[in-house]
Swiss-Prot record:
Gene: DUOX1
TM annotation in the entry: 597-617, 1045-1065, 1081-1101, 1152-1172, 1189-1209, 1227-1247, 1249-1269
Catalytic activity entry: NADH + O2 + H(+) = H2O2 + NAD(+); NADPH + O2 + H(+) = H2O2 + NADP(+)
The name this protein goes by in its record: Dual oxidase 1
Its EC number(s): 1.11.1.-, 1.6.3.1
Membrane topology qualifier: Multi-pass membrane protein
Annotated glycosylation sites: 94, 342, 354, 461, 534
Sequence segments annotated as region (Interaction with TXNDC11): 956-1248
Residue span, Ferric oxidoreductase domain: 1087-1269
Signal peptide segment: 1-21
Binding site for Ca(2+) 1: 828, 830, 832, 834, 839
GO annotation, biological process: cuticle development; cytokine-mediated signaling pathway; defense response; hormone biosynthetic process; hydrogen peroxide biosynthetic process; hydrogen peroxide catabolic process; positive regulation of cell motility; positive regulation of wound healing
Length: 1551
C-alpha cells in the first residue's frame, strides 16, 4: 500500500513538469533581493527595507532612546518571574516539534534583525546579584551584553520620524532562506550545472560555508568551537544555528535538486539557468503553500481569508510586532530535547559530546554545533526530521524551558544568554508599544485588570501574574507587548499574537505580485496552482527521504492518537545531559606577553639605532685614526715588553683594569694593554716597603704599600703567577737597597687596609685646604678636617708629601714639563723626590704674598740651572721655551733667539751674555703689575671675583695702570657693596684709556679721548630692579627674534588648529562612526597628531629648498620671514614631528589594545571595509594590527626609519659620521613613500595626507631639479694646497653666472670619492675674486681622504686633480653683517671659515671706495691653539695689510692656556707683550692682532662697545662655532639687552 502511495506522489510531482512549464523562461523572474515586486513602491519587501509598524513607536525620547530601568523592569527579573517553569508539559493541541522549527524557518525567510547596527549601541542586561546561572558567586557586576540592531539611517531624526529597524532579508515568502537574499548569494549556492544547488562530497549535503558566502558562524557555546568549518551553505545566514534548522534547510536543498533532476530528465535540451529557474519557481510555490495553508492554520488554529487576488496598494512589509510575537511564541514550544527515529518507528539513542548516550539531542548543547556526530549522513538527517514529526512540542503557554531561557547562545564575550530577556530588550530597541496600546490599535477589547489577561492562568497559577504585576508596579499600562502576549496564551496564541501574525501573513500573500496563486503573473496555470495546493510538507518529506508515506501522519504539524510512531514519552530535562555552563571569553588571553614584547621592541628602535650609530661612529673614528696614522701604539722602550700580567684593583666601587707590571732599575712601571704608562713608582732608599699577600680565596692578591704613595693592589689568576712577581720584587727591592716587610692577611682585610687612589685624592684635598688656609687666612672650619678614622691615617695626613706626578697634576701640567722640573727641584730642599707640607708652604707664601722682587728672585733661581747666580742667554732661551710649551707652540730656535736678543736690547743688555738677578728684575720693570697678580695656579683654588673681573677687562680695550693710592675701593658690578683691596691686589679702572690699546697695534696716533669703560650712569642703569632687567631682556629678545617668533607662532598655530580640529571631530562629531565609544583617548590622540604630522612632514620640505630660500631672502619677504633660520626651523619641525609621532604611536597602541579586546560586531562597524560581522565575535590579535595591515606595517617601518634618521641626524653623530648622516637622511624618500601608503589606506578616515603634501612636494622637486642641473657640472680644481693643521686649500673654477655673497656656503662632491656624497663648506673667497676657494680641515674620514687625494700631483697642471661637483650658493645669517654700522664677528674652531670671506670682502670694498654701511668690525677668533688655523692667520695678515681705513679690529684668544695669573702664564704674557711692543707682532701668530690667553668674557667686551660707540643704537653680533661658545655669546647679549641702551642683535650658527 505504501509503495503505491509513493508511486502516486511521484506521478503527481512529475506530471506538472510535463504538463506545465514546457517552455524555457517566459515569465518575469523574481529578483533575489525582493526589489521591484511592487511596481509602484519598488523598495517594499526588499532586503534592507524598513520594518513597518502596526502601532506608533514608543521611545523614551520619542525618537530612538529605548525605555528601560527604572521605568521598566529588569529583563532578567521579568523572565525569571513570568517565563520560568518546569519542562515536560505537552502541547495542548498536540503540535509537533517539526511545526515549531518550521515556524523558525519561515521566520528566517521573512525577517532578520539580529545583525547589530552601526555605530555599536548597547542595551546591556544587568544580572541581579546571586543569579544561579550567570552570577553564582554573587559578584553583582555581571552584565549580559546586548547590541542594538541595525536601523535605517534616515530614521530616528525626530518624533515624527522615529528610529525604524531594517530587515536584513527580503520581506516576502520567496524562499530567501533557501536561495539567499541577493543574486551573489544565490550564485554562491549554485553549482551552475543541471540547475542544481552546489553540494559537497555527499550529494545530500550542500557545500561547506566558505567565501564569498558570509554565513553566520557563531562559536559553539557548549564546546567553544569556532570558524566556518562544519557549517553548511544555506540561503539563510543563520541557517546553522542548531541541527533542527539545519535539517529543514537540508530538506529544501534536497527538494530543489530533486526537482531540477526530474526537469533535466524531462527536458534534456534545457540549460542550467532554465532548469534552475523552473525548479526554484516550483519550490517557492510549494513553500508558500505549505507555510500559509498548512503551517499557519496549525499555528493559529484559524485559516486566512480566501485569496482574492493581488493588491498592489497593500504594504506587505514585516512589522516589528510580528517579529517579536512569532519568535517569542515559538520559544515557549521548544522542548529541552529532540528525538530521532527511523522509518520503522525506532527512536534512536544519540551520542553526546562526551561520548555518552542519551535518548534525545539536548537542545542547549546543540547550538552552532559543527560536524555533529549524530548528523553525518543523509539517513541521520532523515531520522531527525522523522523524530521532530513524531515528537509533541512543549505547551503553548508562558513557560520557556531552561535551554532557551538560560542557555541560549550568547553574544560577545558570554557563551550563554537569556533569550527571553534578549527578546525583551529587542522589543525595547524596536520601540514596541505597551500591551494595552497594541490591543487597542488592533481593535481588541481593552484589558483593565491583570486577571483579565488570562483568566485560566489567574486561576491555576496566579503567582505568575502577581509577580509580573509587582515588577510593573501594578501599572497595567506599562506592561510590554511581549510578556503581555505570552501571558494571555494558553494552548494557542492569545488574541493579540494571533491578530498580529494573521495580519502579517495576509498582507504578505495579498501584496506579493509573485504569489503562486496570482494567475496574472504568468508563473503557473490553474492546473499547476491546484497541484501546488495539494502538496503538503509530508509530500516533500516523502519525496526527499524516499520513505514509505505511511510512516508519517497526514499533517506533520500535528500528532494525534492513531498516527504512526508515537513518541516514547514527553521529554523533560530529566534523563538528558546537563547544559554546558556559561563561560566568558577573554579576547586578550595569551596576548599580554607578546603585546608587551612588541611595544618594548618598538621602544627599542631608538636604542638599536643609537647602538648602530655608536658602532658606526666608532668604526669611522677608528678608520679616521688609521688615516691620520694615530692608531699606532705608544712608543715604549724595549724593556717594557714582556711584563707580568695582572688585574689592578682600584677600589670597592671601581672596576678592575688589566695591567702589565715591569720591574726596572730603581722603579716599578705599570702600563696598560697599549703599553701606555699608567703609573711609575720610584724605589729610593731609605723607604720602608710593605708587601702584603692574601692568604685565602686562592691566594691571588698582592698589596704593595709604599710611603707617600697610594697602594698598588694586584690580582692574579693563579698563586703561581703571583709568586713569580713576588720573587722578582724581592730581588728588585734588595738591589735598590730598600727595606721591606712581608706578611699575610685575609683578602677582605687586605683590601680594607689598602689606600686607594680616591682615598689619596681626598687626603691631598685636605692637604691643600690646610695649606692655603695658612697662606690666605681661611678659617680652619672652612678648610676641612683631617680624617680621624685611625691614628695611623691622621699621622699620614700630617706627614703627607707630594710626588712629582701629584705636584704636576695639581698644576694641570705634565710631569716631564721643564717648568715642573724647575719648580719641583727648587721646592724640594731635602732632595728626597717629594714635597713636604713645609716645603710647599714656603714657596706658596712667595707666590701668594711675596713682592714682585721676591717673585722675580724665585723665578731667577728656578732657571739658574747651573746655580752660579747668573742666567745666560741659553738659560733664558730654555726658560722662554718652557713657557711656550704650555701653548703647544713650536717656535724655531732662530725666532726664540730673536725674541731674547730684542728683550736684551730693549733693556740695554745687548752686550751682556749673562744676567744677574738685578739685571733680570730690571728687564721686568714694565710688568710689575703682572708680577703682582702672579700666583701659583692650583686646581680648586679660585681667584677673588673682583680681581678676575678686572683682569678680564685688562685683556680687552683698556690698558691698565696701577692705582697710585695706597688703598682704593672697588664696587662689584652685581651688588652695591664695596670691597677694599690693597694696591698689590688691584688695578685701577679709573685711569683707563681704552682706545690706545686698539689703535696702537696699527701704529696710529690716538686723536681723541674715548669714553671710560664703566661710567656712573652705566652703573645706575645696571642696578635697576630685577623685574626691569627681565622685562628689558624679554623686550630685546622679542625685538631680536620677532620674525622667528611670528613664523613659529603661525606655523604652530596651524599645527595646533589641525590637531584641535581632528580631536574635536572625533571627540564630539564622529558619533555616527562609533569609534570614540570604543577608543576615545586613543583615537583623539592618534587622529589629532596625524593631522599635525601630515602638515609638518609636508611643509618641512620647504625648509630644505635651498635655492628657493636663497632667492626669497633677497626679496621683501625677508623682512617678515627669517629665511636664514631655515635649518634651525627644519630641526625644530623635525623634533616636534618626532614628539608628535611618538604620541601618535602611543595613541595607536591604545587603539590596538582596545581593538584587540573589542568584539567583531563592533569592529565591523568601525571598519566595514575590513571586517564582516559573521558572528564569530573574536577579534584579530594585536600582531594582526601591527604586522598584517598596511597602516600597521608601514607604521612600524616608519618608526624604524624615523629612529634611524633622527639618531644619525643628531649633532653628536653628525659630527662623528657625516657620511652616516648623509646616507641615513636620504631615507627621507622611503619615509615619504611609507607616509603616502600609510595615510592612503583609509582605515579610519579618507586619505588626507595628499592635501598637505602635494604643493610642498612639487616645490621641493622643482628646487631639487634646479640643484641637479647645477651639481652635475664638473668643476676643475685650479690649485690645491696642503696647509698645516690638516687644512686643505682648494681653489677651483668659478662657474659662469655663479654669483654669491660673502659668508655664503656651497656643497661639493669629489668625483674621486663618489658623486652622491655632498658636504657643505663655507666659501673663503671674496665675491670679487675670479676663482672660488675653500679651506677644508681634515676633521673626518671624508675630509681626510680629500686631503690625500689632493696631494701634490706627480705631473704639472691642474688636470691631475680630480674634479668637483658644486651646488650652491646658499645663504646664512652672516650675510647680514653689512646691515649694521658696527658688527662683531665671533668665530670658534671651524666656525671661523664664514668670516674669512667677509673680512676679505669688507677690505676690498673699502679699498675701492665702495659705499659700505658697516663702519667697524670687531673680529674675535677663539682657538685652542693658533696652530689649528694657520691659514686663517694668513688671511688676517692680508686683511691687516690692506686695511688702510682701520675697519677691522682683530682679537685672538688661545684657550689652551690657563686662565689664571699663575707664574708660567704671567711670564708668557710678559714675553708676548714684549715681543708685540718691539716688533708690533704677536709672538704666537706673527700678526699685529692682540693675542689673549684664555676665553673671551663677552659681557664686559659688549659693555665696552657701548662706551666706544655710544651713537650706535644697534650692533650686530654674528657667532659661528661650537654650541657652548654661541650660547655664551647669546647669554651675554641677553644680559646686555636688559639695559635700555645699545641693542645687540645676535645671529649664530653651530658647527
Amino acid at each position: 500500500m505504501g509503495f503505491c502511495l509513493a508511486l502516486t506522489w511521484t506521478f503527481l510531482v512529475g506530471s506538472w513538469t510535463s504538463m506545465g512549464a514546457q517552455k524555457p523562461i517566459s515569465w518575469e523572474v523574481q529578483r533575489f533581493d525582493g526589489w521591484y515586486n511592487n511596481l509602484m513602491e519598488h523598495k517594499w519587501g526588499s532586503k534592507g527595507s524598513r520594518l513597518q509598524r502596526l502601532v506608533p513607536a514608543s521611545y523614551a525620547d520619542g525618537v530612538y532612546q529605548p525605555l528601560g530601568e527604572p521605568h521598566l523592569p529588569n529583563p532578567r527579573d521579568l523572565s525569571n518571574a513570568a517565563m520560568r517553569g518546569p519542562a515536560g508539559q505537552a502541547s495542548l493541541r498536540n503540535r509537533t516539534v517539526l511545526g515549531v522549527f518550521f515556524g523558525y524557518h519561515v521566520l528566517s525567510d521573512l525577517v532578520s534583525v539580529e545583525t547589530p547596527g552601526c555605530p555599536a549601541e548597547f542595551l546591556n542586561i544587568r544580572i541581579p546579584p546571586g543569579d544561579p546561572v550567570f552570577d553564582p558567586n554573587g559578584r553583582g557586576d555581571v552584565v549580559l551584553p546586548f547590541q542594538r540592531s541595525r536601523w535605517d539611517p534616515e530614521s530616528g531624526q525626530s518624533p515624527s520620524n522615529p528610529r525604524d529597524l531594517t530587515n536584513a532579508v527580503t520581506g516576502w515568502l520567496d524562499g530567501s532562506a533557501i536561495y539567499g537574499s541577493s543574486h551573489s548569494w544565490s550564485d554562491a549556492l549554485r553549482s551552475f550545472s543541471g540547475g542544481q544547488l552546489a553540494s559537497g562530497p555527499d550529494p545530500a549535503f550542500p557545500r561547506n560555508a566558505q567565501p564569498p558566502l558570509l554565513m553566520w558562524s557563531a562559536p559553539d557555546p557548549a564546546s567553544g568551537q569556532r570558524g566556518p568549518g562544519g557549517l553548511y551553505a544555506f540561503g539563510a545566514e543563520r541557517g546553522n544555528r542548531d541541527p533542527f534548522l539545519q535539517a529543514l534547510g537540508l530538506l529544501w536543498f534536497r527538494y530543489h535538486n530533486l526537482c531540477a533532476q526530474r526537469l533535466a530528465r524531462q527536458h534534456p535540451h534545457w540549460g542550467d539557468e532554465e532548469l534552475f529557474q523552473h525548479a526554484r519557481k516550483r519550490v517557492i510555490a510549494t513553500y508558500q503553500n505549505i507555510a500559509l495553508y498548512e503551517w499557519l492554520p496549525s499555528f493559529l488554529q484559524q485559516a486566512p481569508v480566501k485569496y482574492a487576488g493581488y493588491n498592489p496598494f497593500l504594504d506587505p512589509s514585516i512589522s516589528p510586532e510580528f517579529l517579536v510575537a512569532s519568535e517569542q511564541f515559538f520559544s515557549t514550544m521548544v522542548p529541552p530535547g529532540i528525538y530521532m527515529r527511523n522509518a520503522s518507528c525506532h527512536f534512536q539513542e544519540v551520542i553526546n559530546r562526551n561520548s555518552s548516550i542519551s535518548r534525545a539531542l539536548r537542545v542547549c548543547n546543540s547550538y552552532w554545533s559543527r560536524k555533529h556526530p549524530n548528523l553525518r549522513r543523509a539517513e541521520d538527517v532523515d531520522a531527525l526530521l522523522l523524530g521532530m514529526a513524531s515528537q509533541i512540542a512543549e505547551r503553548e503557554d508562558h513557560v520557556v524551558v531552561e535551554d532557551v531561557l538560560d542557555f541560549w547562545p550568547g553574544s560577545l564575550k558570554f557563551s550563554r544568554t537569556d533569550h527571553v530577556a534578549g527578546c525583551l530588550q529587542r522589543g525595547r530597541d524596536l520601540g514596541l508599544p505597551s500591551y494595552t496600546k497594541a490591543r487597542a490599535a488592533l481593535g481588541l477589547p481593552p484589558i483593565t485588570r491583570w486577571q483579565d489577561i488570562n483568566p485560566a492562568l489567574s486561576q491555576n497559577n496566579h503567582t505568575v501574574l502577581e509577580a509580573t504585576a509587582a515588577l510593573y508596579n501594578q501599572d497595567l499600562s506599562q506592561l510590554e507587548l511581549l510578556p503581555g502576549g505570552l501571558l494571555e496564551s494558553h494552548g494557542d496564541p492569545g488574541p493579540l499574537f494571533s491578530a498580529i501574525v494573521l495580519n502579517q501573513f495576509v498582507r504578505l500573500r495579498d501584496g506579493d505580485r509573485y504569489w503562486f496563486e496570482n494567475t496574472r503573473n504568468g508563473l503557473f496555470s490553474e492546473e499547476e496552482i491546484a497541484e501546488i495546493r495539494n502538496t503538503s510538507l509530508r509530500d516533500v518529506l516523502v519525496a526527499v527521504t524516499n520513505m514509505n508515506p505511511s510512516t508519517l501522519q497526514p499533517n506533520v504539524f500535528f500528532w494525534h492518537m492513531g498516527d504512526p510512531c508515537p513518541q516514547p514519552r514527553q521529554l523533560s530535562t530529566q534523563g538528558l545531559p546537563a547544559c554546558a555552563p556559561s563561560t566568558m571569553q577573554d579576547y586578550f588571553e595569551g596576548s599580554g606577553f607578546g603585546f608587551g614584547v612588541t611595544i618594548g621592541t618598538l621602544c627599542c628602535f631608538p636604542l638599536v639605532s643609537l647602538l648602530s650609530a655608536w658602532i658606526v661612529a666608532r668604526l669611522r673614528k677608528k678608520n679616521f685614526k688609521k688615516l691620520q696614522g694615530q692608531d699606532r701604539k705608544s712608543v715604549m722602550s724595549e724593556k717594557l715588553v714582556g711584563g707580568m700580567e695582572a688585574l689592578e684593583w682600584q677600589g670597592h666601587k671601581e672596576p678592575c683594569r688589566p695591567v702589565l707590571v715591569h720591574l726596572q732599575p730603581g722603579q716599578i712601571c705599570v702600563v696598560d694593554g697599549r703599553l701606555s704608562v699608567l703609573r711609575t713608582i720610584q724605589l729610593r732608599p731609605p723607604q720602608q716597603v710593605n708587601l702584603i699577600l692574601s692568604g685565602n680565596r686562592g691566594r691571588r692578591a698582592l698589596l704593595l704599600k709604599i710611603p707617600k704613595e697610594y697602594d698598588l693592589v694586584l690580582l692574579f689568576n693563579l698563586e703561581e703567577e703571583r709568586q713569580v712577581l713576588v720573587e722578582n720584587l724581592r730581588g728588585a727591592l734588595k738591589e735598590s737597597g730598600l727595606k721591606f716587610q712581608e706578611w699575610e692577611l685575609r683578602e677582605q682585610e687586605l683590601m680594607r687596609t689598602a689606600v686607594t687612589r680616591q682615598q689619596r685624592s681626598h687626603l691631598l684635598e685636605t692637604f691643600f685646604r690646610h695649606l692655603f688656609s695658612q697662606v690666605l687666612d681661611i678659617d680652619q672650619a672652612d678648610a676641612g678636617t683631617l680624617p680621624l678614622d685611625s691614628s695611623q691615617k691622621v699621622q699620614e695626613a700630617l706627614t703627607c708629601e707630594l710626588s712629582r706626578a701629584e705636584f704636576a697634576e695639581s698644576l694641570g701640567l705634565k710631569p716631564q714639563d721643564m717648568f715642573v722640573e724647575s719648580m719641583f727641584s727648587l721646592a724640594d730642599k731635602d732632595g728626597n723626590g717629594y714635597l713636604s707640607f713645609r716645603e710647599f708652604l714656603d714657596i706658596l707664601v712667595v707666590f701668594m704674598k711675596g713682592s714682585p722682587e721676591e717673585k722675580s728672585r724665585l723665578m731667577f733661581r728656578m732657571y739658574d740651572f747651573d746655580g752660579n747666580g747668573l742666567i745666560s742667554k741659553d738659560e733664558f732661551i730654555r726658560m722662554l721655551r718652557s713657557f711656550i710649551e704650555i701653548s703647544n707652540n713650536c717656535l724655531s730656535k732662530a725666532q726664540l733667539t730673536e725674541v731674547v736678543e730684542s728683550m736684551f736690547r730693549e733693556s740695554g743688555f745687548q752686550d751682556k751674555e749673562e744676567l744677574t738677578w738685578e739685571d733680570f728684575h730690571f728687564m721686568l720693570r714694565d710688568h710689575d703689575s703682572e708680577l703682582r697678580f702672579t700666583q701659583l695656579c692650583v686646581r680648586g683654588v679660585e681667584v677673588p671675583e673682583v680681581i678676575k673681573d678686572l683682569c678680564r677687562r685688562a685683556s680687552y680695550i683698556s690698558q691698565e695702570k696701577i692705582c697710585p693710592s695706597p688703598r682704593v675701593s672697588a664696587r662689584c658690578p652685581h651688588s652695591n657693596t664695596e670691597v677694599e683691596w690693597t694696591p698689590q691686589r688691584l688695578q685701577c679702572p679709573v685711569d683707563t684709556d681704552p682706545p690706545q690699546e686698539i689703535r696702537r697695534r696699527f701704529g696710529k696716533k690716538v686723536t681723541s679721548f674715548q669714553p671710560l669703560l664703566f661710567t656712573e650712569a652705566q652703573r645706575e642703569k645696571f642696578q635697576r630692579s630685577r623685574r626691569h632687567q627681565t622685562l628689558q631682556q624679554f623686550k630685546r629678545f622679542i625685538e631680536n627674534y620677532r620674525r622667528h617668533i611670528g613664523c613659529v607662532a603661525v606655523f604652530y598655530a596651524i599645527t595646533g588648529g589641525l590637531f584641535l580640529e581632528r580631536a574635536y571631530y572625533y571627540a564630539f562629531g564622529a558619533h555616527h562612526m562609533g569609534i570614540t565609544d570604543t577608543t576615545r583617548v586613543g583615537i583623539i590622540l592618534s587622529r589629532g597628531t596625524a593631522a599635525s604630522i601630515s602638515f609638518m612632514f609636508s611643509y618641512i620640505l620647504l625648509t630644505m629648498c635651498r635655492n628657493l630660500i636663497t632667492f626669497l631672502r633677497e626679496t621683501f619677504l625677508n623682512r617678515y620671514v627669517p629665511f636664514d633660520a631655515a635649518v634651525d626651523f627644519h630641526r625644530l619641525i623635525a623634533s616636534t614631528a618626532i614628539v608628535l609621532t611618538v604620541l601618535h604611536s602611543a595613541g595607536h597602541v591604545v587603539n590596538v589594545y582596545l581593538f584587540s579586546i573589542s568584539p567583531l560586531s563592533v569592529l565591523s562597524c568601525l571598519f566595514p571595509g575590513l571586517f564582516h560581522n559573521d558572528g564569530s565575535e573574536f577579534p584579530q590579535k594585536y600582531y594582526w594590527w601591527f604586522f598584517q595591515t598596511v597602516p600597521g606595517l608601514t607604521g612600524v617601518m616608519l618608526l624604524l626609519v624615523l629612529a634611524i634618521m633622527y639618531v644619525f641626524a643628531s649633532h653628536h653623530f653628525r659630527r662623528h659620521s657625516f657620511r652616516g648622516f648623509w646616507l641615513t637622511h636620504h631615507l627621507y624618500i622611503l619615509l615619504y613613500v611609507l607616509l603616502i601608503i600609510h595615510g592612503s589606506f583609509g582605515l579610519i578616515q579618507l586619505p588626507r595626507f595628499h592635501i598637505f603634501f602635494l604643493v610642498p612636494a612639487l616645490i621641493y622637486v622643482g628646487d631639487k631639479l634646479v640643484s641637479l642641473s647645477r651639481k652635475k657640472v664638473e668643476i676643475s680644481v685650479v690649485k690645491a694646497e696642503l696647509l698645516p693643521s690638516g687644512v686643505t686649500h682648494l681653489q677651483f673654477q668659478r662657474p659662469q653666472g655663479f654669483e654669491y655673497k660673502s659668508g655664503q656656503w656651497v656643497q661639493i662632491a669629489c668625483l674621486a670619492l663618489g658623486t652622491t656624497e655632498y658636504h657643505p663648506f663655507t666659501l673663503t673667497s671674496a665675491p670679487h675674486e675670479d676663482t672660488l676657494s675653500l679651506h677644508i680641515r681634515a676633521a673626518g674620514p671624508w675630509t681626510t681622504r680629500l686631503r690625500e687625494i689632493y696631494s701634490p700631483p706627480t705631473g704639472d697642471g691642474c688636470a691631475k686633480y680630480p674634479k668637483l661637483y658644486l651646488d650652491g650658493p646658499f645663504g646664512e645669517g652672516h650675510q647680514e653683517w653689512h646691515k649694521f654700522e658696527v658688527s662683531v664677528l665671533v668665530g670658534g674652531g671651524i666656525g671661523v671659515t664664514p668670516f674669512a670671506s667677509i673680512l676679505k670682502d669688507l677690505v676690498f670694498k673699502s679699498s675701492v671706495s665702495c659705499q659700505v654701511f658697516c663702519k667697524k668690525i670687531y673680529f674675535i677668533w677663539v682657538t685652542r691653539t693658533q696652530r689649528q688655523f694657520e691659514w686663517l692667520a694668513d688671511i688676517i695678515r692680508e686683511v691687516e695689510e690692506n686695511d688702510c681705513q682701520d675697519l677691522v679690529s682683530v682679537h685672538i684668544y688661545i684657550t689652551q692656556l690657563a686662565e689664571k695669573f699663575d707664574l708660567r702664564t704671567t711670564m708668557l704674557y710678559i714675553c708676548e707683550r714684549h715681543f708685540q711692543k718691539v716688533l708690533n707682532r704677536s709672538l704666537f701668530t706673527g700678526l699685529r692682532s692682540i693675542t689673549h690667553f684664555g676665553r673671551p668674557p663677552f659681557e664686559p667686551f659688549f659693555k665696552s662697545l657701548q662706551e666706544v660707540h655710544p651713537q650706535v643704537r644697534k650692533i650686530g653680533v654674528f657667532s659661528c662655532g661650537p654650541p657652548g661658545m654661541t650660547k655664551n655669546v647669546e647669554k651675554a647679549c641677553q644680559l646686555i639687552n636688559r639695559q635700555d641702551r645699545t641693542h645687540f642683535s645676535h645671529h649664530y650658527e653651530n658647527f
